[in-house]
Amino acid sequence: MSFIDKILDKMSLNSEDDEEFDNEDYYLDDEEEEELPRNPFRRKKEAVEEETAIKSTRRDTTPKEKPVKTTSKITPISKSSRKQVASDMEVCVIKPSSIEDEIEITDTLLNGRTVVINMEGLNVDVAQRIIDFTSGSAYALHGNLQKISNFIFIATPHGVDISGDIQSLMDSFDLPGSSY
């Protein structure tokens, strides 16, 4: 044993176990090759060429079926590439009469439409519950909710911005019902 072999043995880099695994791989390769009948006197290249020729003739003898071309009826459209249609730019005015009307407000926001909520003549407790629900819906949809006047609010879906201070605009026009 040479000096290098002793060092490799100490570091466990030259283990006899590795040799056993190498030998097992050698036998595994032989078992796979024995599955195919072969002539030991033939060269590998000729054997491979013959096997590919046999496989191609097997493919040729089977009846060929034409692949059926199917097209998907669903076309994915990303929101950023979608062009806004006039119906998407619609502003809906809803005058709720009970808390159940909040579902209509949320569905309208889900459809990407702006909602003006007119709660004039509604009980203050019911109006507060509707505003709380609408505020949660707008927040969940990354939208916005702003007060226009005492009992009129505007809720917008994601992608629709409200610019300016609507309350100050309403005060400047001195419209009835716009003051606190």
UniProtKB/Swiss-Prot annotation:
Coiled-coil ranges from the UniProt annotation: none
Region described as Disordered: spans on this chain: 14-81
Keywords assigned by UniProt, alphabetized: Cell cycle, Cell division, Cytoplasm, Septation
Compartments it resides in: Cytoplasm
Gene Ontology BP annotations: division septum assembly; FtsZ-dependent cytokinesis
Summary of subunit composition and partner proteins: Homodimer. Interacts with FtsZ.
Family under the similarity heading: Belongs to the SepF family.
Function noted in UniProt: Cell division protein that is part of the divisome complex and is recruited early to the Z-ring. Probably stimulates Z-ring formation, perhaps through the cross-linking of FtsZ protofilaments. Its function overlaps with FtsA.
PANTHER family in UniProt: CELL DIVISION PROTEIN SEPF
Protein name according to UniProt: Cell division protein SepF
Gene this chain is encoded by: sepF
